Structures are given as C-alpha cells and as structure tokens.
UniProtKB/Swiss-Prot annotation:
Residues 1-28 form the signal peptide. One of its GO terms (biological process) is killing of cells of another organism. SMART domains: Knot1. Disulfide bonds join 31-74, 42-62, 48-68, 52-70. It comes from Glycine max (Soybean). It comes from the Eukaryota. One of its GO terms (cellular component) is extracellular region. Belongs to the DEFL family. Protease inhibitor I18 (RTI/MTI-2) subfamily. It is found in: Secreted. This is Defensin-like protein. CDD domains: Knot1 (cd00107).
Amino acid sequence: MEMRKSCGFFFLLLLLVFASQVVVQTEGRVCESQSHGFHGLCNRDHNCALVCRNEGFSGGRCKRSRRCFCTRIC
C-alpha cells in the first residue's frame, strides 16, 4: 500500500512538473502591404522577403497574381 501511495505521489509530481513547462505562444495580427520596391512577377518568397526587409518590414511572400506582399506584426 505504501508503494502505491509513493507511485501516485511521484506521478502527480511528474505531472505538475510537465504542466508547468507548457508555454502558450500567442502571436499578434499580421498586417500585409503590397511591396513598393519589388518589380516584376513574384515567383519566390525568399526574394520578396529580402526586398520587404529592405523596406522596413519583417518579411514578405508572393500571393495574389504573383505580387509581393510585405508582412509585419500589427
């Protein structure tokens, strides 16, 4: 019986340790704006993101008729 109580206590302690390690990550809204510096058809997100970073945004991606849209956290 004593062994069973010890196992139960150990399980609860282990559960408490793992539960305290869970971190909920929240993200803000992402705002998009069409790039003013990107010219031509947007085929690669990487190129779009580089141009957007030079414009002061955090990144960018190709979408909507192959146009480059810059992104940032609002």
